[in-house]
Amino acid sequence: MKKVILSVSDKSGIVDFAKSLVGLDYELYSTGGTKRALDEAGVPVKSVSDLTQFDEIMDGRVKTLHPAVHGGILADRDKPEHLQQLKDKGIDLIDIVVVNLYPFKETVANPDVTEMDAIENIDIGGPTMLRAAAKNFKHVTTIVDPSDYDEVIEHIKNDSLDETFRKSLMIKVFEHTNDYDNAIVNFFKENKEPLRYGENPQQDAYFVRTSDAPNTIAGAKQLHGKQLSFNNIKDADATLALAKKFEEPAAVAVKHMNPCGVGVGSSIEEAFQNAYDADSQSIFGGIVAVNRPVTKELAEKLHSIFLEVVIAPSFTEEALEVLTKKKNIRLLEVEMTVDHDEKEYVSVSGGYLVQDKDTKTISRDDMKVVTKAEPTEEQWKAMELGWKVVPSVKSNAIILSNDHQTVGIGAGQMNRVGSAEIAIERAIEINDNVALVSDGFFPMDDTVELAAKAGIKAIIQPGGSIKDQDSIDMADKHGIAMVMTGVRHFKH
């Protein structure tokens, strides 16, 4: 019978996965909390101590660090001498290793974390098993990501758990352990950068880097300018996240954590001009991110206005010559790749919240036209642009957009109509090709009625209100095309 070791901190999906393995005639071995979870769910599982014939010691610090575990994982099954040594020592082969590590990043994200808390969340046995199994990917399947559970089961059922698939899992493992080790290094280097002050001058602050990945603000390469402030860092992070959403040339301007202008175009220069024209007043003193290299032509446009920070994947030498004439402007070089599995953390009194970042994307095929009127192609493009932007706007959020820029943004109001009124009032244009975009459903039809009075002919919103039909009827009354996505994008 083939053997599996399971030892996971993130227990999402582990019970169903374990049940599937048992159904496929695998014998399960586990440790600590994972074994308790499986026992409570009635899944047949043995203790790793049954393999090692050695009890856990030192409060669980030593559980799997044993030849009976690592011999069974590392044995090269193409070498008869390896198999003979296992037989001589009474060691069984291990075919699948399922491990994810102690939550070190989550632990050190707590501002009140102690060094001892951090130390106790440094995993030793987990990375050792992962690396051993990944090294032997020709013979052993290694799973570090719960999202791979279903695919692994399908491969087992289809007898396609081959070396190519195992190699793809191996790559994930080494990426994961590398990121894990970097987080530990960065924490214990005491990578706490004192800041001049926090959100306000009366607040002390510092910047703790838990990653130096080149696609993050923490890992950004600062090419010029003063030290980033607390508010610069927060705004820069929000600006970067939004710029990464676009594949076409795009420019994003942010003030106080809210976009004030977003533009796309056939060139990065055109995209920035569209973003600037979206709100040429609010961009003053803001932060701009572009997802293409900054050219001399773009640099001259940027140089003509006061900006705190410019973020880009790179700057040409000519662009730097222009921009560095301003002593204080911060220039950040950051990769524009997206990490879909990122977490975000929010401190609350007595603890902190952890959630996945809101990176869900949808296509037209996922959207539903609910009105008699169908959107035109121009309206579809306007809705798609606005739908990328609206998750970055404080709720309640209403955006007006065309196919190449935001034209009005209403953010952070306590009722949706209030945000719509602001977006309409500040709009640089309203015509048949402008769409109204809402981050949440309409509890009543008043926002649709307001849009109709303003001359808006296309709306996109999540839907899901018990009064959706009232909004649909109001849209039909005024010949408005309305699309529902089934996805909400609140931002607090």
UniProtKB/Swiss-Prot annotation:
Keyword rRNA-binding: no
Official protein name in the record: Bifunctional purine biosynthesis protein PurH
Cystine bridges: none
GO BP: 'de novo' IMP biosynthetic process
One Pfam short name: AICARFT_IMPCHas
HAMAP family, sorted: PurH
Family statement drawn from the similarity comment of this UniProt entry: Belongs to the PurH family.
Gene name linked to the record: purH
Gene3D superfamilies in the cross-refs: 3.40.140.20, Methylglyoxal synthase-like domain (3.40.50.1380)
Domain MGS-like intervals: 1-144
Pathway involvement of the protein, from the record: Purine metabolism; IMP biosynthesis via de novo pathway; 5-formamido-1-(5-phospho-D-ribosyl)imidazole-4-carboxamide from 5-amino-1-(5-phospho-D-ribosyl)imidazole-4-carboxamide (10-formyl THF route): step 1/1; Purine metabolism; IMP biosynthesis via de novo pathway; IMP from 5-formamido-1-(5-phospho-D-ribosyl)imidazole-4-carboxamide: step 1/1
Record field: catalytic activity: (6R)-10-formyltetrahydrofolate + 5-amino-1-(5-phospho-beta-D-ribosyl)imidazole-4-carboxamide = 5-formamido-1-(5-phospho-D-ribosyl)imidazole-4-carboxamide + (6S)-5,6,7,8-tetrahydrofolate; IMP + H2O = 5-formamido-1-(5-phospho-D-ribosyl)imidazole-4-carboxamide
GO MF entries: IMP cyclohydrolase activity; phosphoribosylaminoimidazolecarboxamide formyltransferase activity
Lineage: Bacteria, Bacillati, Bacillota, Bacilli, Bacillales
GO cellular component: cytosol
